[in-house]
Amino acid sequence: MDNCNAWDKLLSQNESTINSTETATITAIIYSPSSKTLHQFINICFPEGSNSILDTTLINYATIGWTNDLKENYSVDVYTLIRNTDDALDLLKPFLQEHSSKVRWLILLDWTLNDQKLWLNELSYAFNKIKQLNDDNEFSVWCLNSGEILNLQRHTTVWQSVHIDFILQTLRSFCYFNDSSLFYICEDHTEEKREEAQRLKYQELLKHFCEDRDMKDHIEMVKRSEILIPKGCDSIGLIKTVDERFEPTEVKEQHFLARYMDFIPTIDKIREDRKTTSGIDLDKLYPLEVFKVNIQEELGKMFAKYRENSRI
């Protein structure tokens, strides 16, 4: 009996050490409007070297590992998907059917793509579709290049602060009612040390989101280009402080979409960088047949890689 008690005591003393060496597995899906946006997001928010294994023109999969500030190890199954087809999300069906755990969604928007008028419609469609594909989701919306907000106001005659605020309140309301986090990513390239500090900040933010950790220390609601609002940290009252005339509950109503699209301006000239090297305009949605790849073959390779990694 004494030997048993001694063994139990030894196990108890070393339990925390044993647990600290375990690796938790997470599933994350990045849904991006373009390859360029995806490349930038991975470069900013993921560990160095992730771009080469996650970059894609349509769909990809890889496993990324990291150790957080608590010395906890994580293995993250990351899927990347480009929103350049009208049924892109359906490509994830076979992979989502394999999962029984929560899926972290990182839905990207990009201030440099001149498609702000479409954001609400695209988010509504994506969230509804995702909820049909999977029951257990953790949502986040990431708006890249939010420093472009200042350029739009400085260098165009159509963009004013009222438009920026209207988009912000719309996104905050949508995320509030859909239990989603909202993060603006603003890079400052003026100083190398500051740029590196920003990347470390956003990498920490991503880790906290994926690990379901408390994010109250990461809240920013004042600086328009640096908004950081984790799920559960916003409210109707806080949203209205931007402009009290805005009614957050209206975002849930069908008529609001038309109002949003009518109010948000566009720039006359669509930028050339929205076209891929193959000449496909990412402002438009195309059937999968347009892309010069064998979709079934690519999915087969990706699924084989997933099964090998998962040891199914």
Swiss-Prot record:
InterPro entries assigned: Dynein_light_int_chain
Alphabetized UniProt keyword annotations: Cytoplasm, Cytoskeleton, Dynein, Microtubule, Motor protein
Residues in the signal sequence: none
Pfam family membership, one: DLIC
BP-aspect Gene Ontology terms: establishment of mitotic spindle localization; establishment of mitotic spindle orientation; nuclear migration along microtubule
GO cellular component terms listed in the entry, alphabetical order: cytoplasm; cytoplasmic dynein complex; cytoplasmic microtubule
Coiled-coil intervals: none
Annotated family: Belongs to the dynein light intermediate chain DYN3 family.
Function: Component of the cytoplasmic dynein which acts as a motor for the intracellular retrograde motility of vesicles and organelles along microtubules. May play an important role in the proper orientation of the mitotic spindle into the budding daughter cell yeast. Probably required for normal progression of the cell cycle.
Subunit record text: The dynein complex consists of at least two heavy chains and a number of intermediate and light chains. Interacts with DYN1.
Additional notes on this entry: Present with 1170 molecules/cell in log phase SD medium.
UniProt protein name: Cytoplasmic dynein intermediate light chain DYN3
UniProt organism field: Saccharomyces cerevisiae (strain ATCC 204508 / S288c) (Baker's yeast)
Gene: DYN3
